[in-house]
Amino acid sequence: RVLFRSYMAVIDGQLVVPCGTQLPALFNLASGKLEKYTTGWGGRVGLPKGTWFVAGSGQLLSHSGDLYDMRRPNDEKFANSGNRRDFKSKLYPGFMTRIQVEPTNQKSIGDFRRPVLSNNTMFYTDNGIVAEDISEIKLTPRQADPRRDQDKYPDKWQASFPRRWKLETDLRVRIQAGNRVYCTAPGKVAAIDLPAADGQPRISWEATIDGDPLTLVAANGRLFVTTRQGRLYAFGASAAPEPVTHARAAHTGNNSSEQVKLITAATGISKGYCLVLGLDNGELAEALSQQFTVIAIDNDADRINRLRSRWHGLGIYGTHITALLGDPLTYNLPPFLANLVVTETARLFNAEAAAEPPANIYHALRPYGGTACLPVALKGRQVWKDSAAKLSNAQVRESGRWLLLSRTGALAQSADWSHAAGGSGNSGSSEDRYLRGPLGLLWYDGSIRWERQPGKTEVRVAGGRIFVRADRMLAIDVFTGRRLWDQPLPQAAGAGKVGEFVATADAIYVAAGRSCVVLDARTGKQRSQFQMPEKIGGSLVHLRLWKNYLVSYLGKTVICLDRQSGQLLWSFEASRPELSLAVGGQRVFISELLNTRRGETIEKSGVKTYALDIATGKQAWQGAGGAELRYSETHDLLLTATAIYKGLDGTVHRKSVIADPTKDKWNYKSSGYIAGDSLLIGGSDNFTMYQLTSGVQLTKKISWFRRGCTPLRTSPYMVTTRYQGQAAYIDLDTMQFQSLWNLRGACSNNIFPANGILNVPNLSGGCTCNYTPTSMALVPRTTLQAQPKK
């Protein structure tokens, strides 16, 4: 639950660890025990917020520009708590008292002060450099500050310290070393001599630099300065010789590079994660690291240490290549990791040593084409082929001296989240039956943060890729979190300009005003652009893709295009522009929506639901409209405001209102979510589950406290939501909640059950709450370890 970030500090006998946007964590130095801690709050005006900075002296802790007394327990209370439980005192680091509040620490954190603290003096920047005596603390009840007159959560106490001196300057104090403090300004570094008691400071020297100073370190009689632009400066009492540049060792020769070319040609794989199971001289692994992220495994400790040293010297260890000590054939590898598996040690795969594929190899291969390229002896290959025939989506082929074992296609019974509401049926669910609880962590990453608000960021999951559309389109590997590509979008297709996009394994269709932009799913590059017919007005919204048909509407006109050519196949005129679309089972379903603000009713408005043949656009049947449509292609059932219909012919499968509720409890007013074989009726913080086909009630009504606006997403065995402020999922097998502790659920719900993975991209941008800004992926725990052969 605690994510360590940046530099730690030992203050008042405790280890203080900054945790990024989380509040800092305090650990007992002797035992390592985590002290009192809270997170997942903040965002309110004036409440503590996490950053990378901690510093301290004596009993004082500085964090985010705020100052805390580590020995004074917090006794804060909400100004408006009423009769509810008051937990304000627990919203501070270590539940200790904040005695000074950084003026910029309001709704969001501005450029907060980073004071320098010595044994009895605090130096900080406030329209100059100020020095105060922190050995004398004067604590008084806080008076209302004009900058916080709208603050519902004011602190009780305010500390003040006797001022030693103030130096009027544009410099900012950064560090103290000896009897000087060192300061910076854009393009400038300076040293200030500290005065004796009652004296005044003076600037000892100044120097100009190229760029904006970022960090300072004083050591060995020198001051080292880095800049934001990537330069390094050193200052000292006397001139120093030119720094020695240590040349990196040369990469390996052409033999291994040629072998890499042969391997990539045989497999068709040229990037991603590569496992090297068994090392010899490390040359093949090293050559592969120029294209792949390589993880090499060998059971010879001396060889591992020798190669680690070499790769450190090349500057590639830990970034391009990693070496692990262990048995290459039994090492406990994570699932779905490897795009490519090779070896430097052919003897591991001769007929005697590996009579059949080791379980961890196929287990580690990435779906959608991960391939092991291994020198399996000819007489042993039939056993590998027989073994692969028993595995789901395994394929074996031969290429000269190599046997190629691939994991093709998707995980069995997994499904995409290709549309805004799951699939083309607008069910609010994916059809993913691979993903089933309990779940375990597959990967996490905090390098990217997208906006959390609905419409600012759109996410789809298809073909083993997470597609994120903000002002650009970016693709991430579902199974590893690896960034695949990042491409700009045409201006009309940027965030906030248009509606949805649809993703498949091969293409992405982006609604872009009067056109539909088609991107290649593998590269992100534009493949084509379909212009809308001039005779049809309006902008393209709410795309639906089913097989070779692309359905959408402009204004009141529903259109169907050939998804390959963009040719208009047919159009249909509805009575109003407020429509809901669901597509599947050879049908296009169109519901004309009610305007509830005007008090419209289904009976008086005459709104309709139409079912059209997707190939011709001819009407198959019609019924009453009024609400969002949900369609299950598996069961050919269409959920509307008045009934559940058979999609093919419009036969009423079940009405929404039961004449005699004493005999049948089925009743609903909203369309709910179709989750596999179940129907979930309720809202964003409650539902009752029914069997879709029979209407039998499966569970009592379940409800929970979200503390946020996250709507539901579903799959046959999962519901994703926000629970007590945390991102969470509900296991529909057990009806148990599982919080993803300290992870924020986005306003638009950032938890997508698809491709066999619970995908959680980091949609927390613009949030000032102290959650961990992290993307992650979870899988069924049963898949985390390779299953031994019986």
Where are these regions (language model features)?
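A short glycine-rich, Lys/Arg-flanked "PGG" loop and its adjoining helix->strand segment in the class I
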Residues: 351-370
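Conserved SAM-binding strand-loop segment of SAM-dependent methyltransferases
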Residues: 316-328
